């Protein structure tokens, strides 16, 4: 007896594994998972570390080989590194005992997310791709690479790639006769749904810890949704207190830059180059606007919980909830969820338009929403979303017929991803008088106007800009890409940091100063064994954005810091940090070539790091003494590449 099309389709399976630092790779993985579902593959989407090393090394056939194919989606972090939620999986692939046939029979495709302003563009995806091939896996479709520097962002390369990939899957794995792809205008079952919390069970007393589903918590616990009081159970987070939020640029300056100081009571340790990750919150007026538009008023302040949808209830542990730790949130209401977790001011992806098209009965609105999901209308999609930076809240206001069920909030809307900020404090600035840890940040408040003449604000910096001293917020301490050894830190160093890019470099300088002070205390009659230190700082105007100017003289006395500045608007001809390098070829050749020094570059991605790289290559080419070593162009490029490989050339840009 032959199988029915539905029975035959159940043998089609797909696994989508992602490694994501900021959430972009996870969003791409979810979109690829939805694509596979629409082609009738039973699909699982999970972070790479969820495939435990024991499963991978002991039961490979039951895991990776059991799927028709596996899609690996990975972003590159730091200096070509694998994201934290994929590292244990990656390390398990590097075991020396694995034979070259270990992954034979595993069909895979990979997609990487990177930034071409970094020397190691998409390094993580390329490393993973190469290792999978070494272990015998079979690539079923050419890997894709997204570039954050694309004019349309990551989707500029992802959308054409996924469109062609869909056609390839239909050719390679044709659907059983009588079965057709699930069309975009047909809704997929939600993976996770919100539900009213169960009323208190009989015999239980109603205390502060248990409220029935008919009660609201807005009056009883007003602090839960306060912007300046953070109760979110974010995994691996510290509860920090904001002690300073000071504007360091003049009121007349075009940019609002803040020096923000946070403290925690414990003596947490961190190193120069490390980062603080802050998850933003929404403003009450924005949340109320969404509640009003959707008609969620009656539900807004009732207790809710997140539960797996019908398809996930028996799917096993691979499917992690979209918001880790949410079950520990005290008194979770729909309003609290929207305030603390849902990114309603994000620029929508194509998948958002596909999702909300199912929640309107207005045929004109539905047709237009689905047009935005069609690859043939990519330019219109970008003209409507990324180019004017139009937010989800604005889209829903314009497509006012869309009414999303509150139960589907986490399926339709993106969740907040933490924003990373380089720590600016180091050495003696890292500790409070009470022995706790202190984190100082230098943050530019994002606020600008787009082609549709509306003011745009960064979601996280808008949140930070209004926090007052005494506010609490949950922060995650993360390793950064500028980490260095002690020898590198105290050796010859060139630090290049225009604008707020100077933040992690300040941390390095104060760390070097702490080393010098400690050495002098132990060896009062000896000079500290430190190399020359040069800071290249760039800004618009010396009077407006020369951050930490008063500290550089103190550091000059302590560690011999030499500061070069490039203020682009203080004279008729613009000057940038790369111009300083070109004026001092001999100096940079001596420090970085003759003395084997290290260079650290931090600031905006795009033209600056590329221009600095080119200027350094020119310094290696032309900066040598007439009677000393000379490098041709090829040799200069190879020398800089060698610096990268040995960790003497590091870049952190955004």
From Swiss-Prot:
Catalyzed reactions per annotation: 2 oxidized [2Fe-2S]-[protein] + NADPH = 2 reduced [2Fe-2S]-[protein] + NADP(+) + H(+)
Domain Flavodoxin-like residue range list: 14-166
An annotated Gene Ontology molecular function: oxidoreductase activity
Residues reported to bind FMN: 20-25, 75-78, 113-122
Residue ranges occupied by any FAD-binding FR-type domain in the UniProt entry: 235-485
Classification via InterPro entries: CysJ-like_FAD-binding, FAD-bd_FR_type, Flavdoxin-like, Flavodoxin/NO_synth, Flavoprot_Pyr_Nucl_cyt_Rdtase, Flavoprotein-like_sf, FNR_nucleotide-bd, NADPH_Cyt_P450_Rdtase_alpha
Location relative to the cell: Cytoplasm; Mitochondrion
PROSITE patterns assigned: FAD_FR (PS51384), FLAVODOXIN_LIKE (PS50902)
Subunit structure as annotated in this protein's UniProt entry: Interacts with dre2; as part of the cytosolic iron-sulfur (Fe-S) protein assembly (CIA) machinery.
Protein name: NADPH-dependent diflavin oxidoreductase 1
Species the sequence originates in: Aspergillus fumigatus (strain ATCC MYA-4609 / CBS 101355 / FGSC A1100 / Af293)
Protein encoded by which gene: tah18
């Amino acid at each position: 007896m032959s199988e029915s099309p539905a029975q035959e389709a159940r043998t089609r399976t797909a696994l989508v594994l992602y490694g994501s630092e900021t959430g972009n790779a996870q969003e791409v993985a979810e979109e690829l998972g939805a694509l596979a579902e629409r082609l009738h593959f039973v699909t699982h989407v999970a972070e790479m570390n969820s495939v435990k090393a024991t499963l991978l090394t002991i039961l490979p056939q039951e895991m990776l080989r059991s799927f028709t194919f596996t899609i690996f989606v990975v972003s590159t972090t730091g200096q070509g590194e694998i994201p934290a939620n994929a590292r244990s999986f990656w390390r398990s692939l590097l075991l020396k005992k694995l034979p070259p046939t270990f992954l034979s029979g595993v069909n895979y495709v990979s997609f990487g997310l990177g930034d071409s302003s970094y020397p190691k563009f998409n390094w993580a995806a390329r490393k993973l791709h190469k290792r999978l091939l070494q272990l015998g896996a079979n690539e079923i479709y050419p890997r894709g690479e997204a570039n954050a520097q694309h004019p349309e962002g990551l989707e500029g390369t992802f959308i054409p790639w996924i469109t062609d990939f869909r056609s390839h899957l239909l050719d390679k794995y044709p659907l059983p006769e009588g079965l057709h792809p699930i069309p975009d205008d047909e809704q997929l079952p939600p993976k996770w749904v919100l539900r009213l919390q169960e009323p208190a069970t009989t015999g239980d007393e109603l205390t502060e810890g248990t409220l029935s589903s008919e009660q609201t918590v807005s009056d009883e616990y007003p602090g839960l949704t306060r912007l300046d009081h953070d109760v979110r159970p974010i995994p691996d987070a510290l509860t920090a207190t904001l002690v300073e939020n000071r504007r360091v640029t003049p009121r007349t300056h075009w940019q609002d830059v803040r020096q923000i100081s946070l403290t925690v009571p414990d003596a947490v340790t961190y190193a120069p180059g490390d980062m603080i990750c802050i998850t933003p919150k929404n403003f009450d007026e924005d949340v109320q606007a969404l509640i009003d538009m959707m008609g969620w008023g009656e539900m807004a302040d009732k207790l809710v919980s997140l539960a797996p949808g019908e398809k996930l209830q028996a799917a096993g542990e691979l499917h992690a909830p979209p918001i880790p730790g949410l079950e520990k949130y005290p008194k979770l209401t729909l309003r609290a969820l929207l305030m603390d977790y849902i990114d309603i001011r994000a620029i929508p992806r194509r998948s958002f338009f596909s999702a909300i098209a199912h929640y309107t009965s207005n045929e004109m609105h539905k047709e237009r929403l689905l047009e935005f999901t069609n690859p043939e209308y990519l330019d219109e999609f970008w003209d409507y979303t990324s180019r004017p930076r139009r937010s989800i809240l604005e889209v829903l206001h314009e497509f006012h017929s869309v009414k999303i069920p509150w139960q589907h909030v986490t399926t339709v809307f993106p969740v907040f991803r933490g924003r990373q900020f380089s720590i600016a404090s180091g050495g003696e600035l890292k500790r409070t008088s009470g022995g706790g840890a202190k984190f100082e940040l230098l943050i530019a408040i994002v606020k600008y106007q787009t082609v549709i003449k509306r003011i745009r604000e960064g979601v996280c910096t808008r949140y930070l800009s209004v926090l007052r001293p005494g506010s609490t917020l949950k922060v995650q301490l993360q390793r950064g890409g500028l980490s260095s050894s002690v020898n590198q830190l105290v050796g010859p160093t060139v630090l290049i940091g225009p604008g707020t890019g100077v933040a992690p470099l300040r941390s390095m300088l104060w760390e070097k100063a702490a080393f010098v002070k400690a050495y002098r205390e132990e060896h009062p009659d000896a000079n500290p064994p430190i190399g020359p230190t040069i800071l290249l700082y760039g800004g618009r105007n010396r009077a407006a954005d020369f951050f930490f100017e008063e500290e550089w003289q103190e550091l000059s006395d302590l560690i011999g810091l030499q500061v070069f500045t490039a203020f682009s608007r203080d004279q008729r001809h613009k000057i940038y940090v790369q111009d300083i390098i070109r004026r001092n070829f001999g100096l940079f050749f001596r420090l970085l070539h003759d003395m084997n020094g290290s260079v650290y570059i931090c600031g905006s991605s795009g033209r600056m790091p590329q221009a600095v790289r080119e200027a350094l290559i020119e310094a290696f080419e032309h900066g040598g003494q007439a009677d000393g070593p000379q490098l041709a162009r090829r040799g200069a490029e190879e020398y800089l590449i060698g610096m990268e490989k040995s960790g003497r050339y590091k870049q952190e840009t955004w």
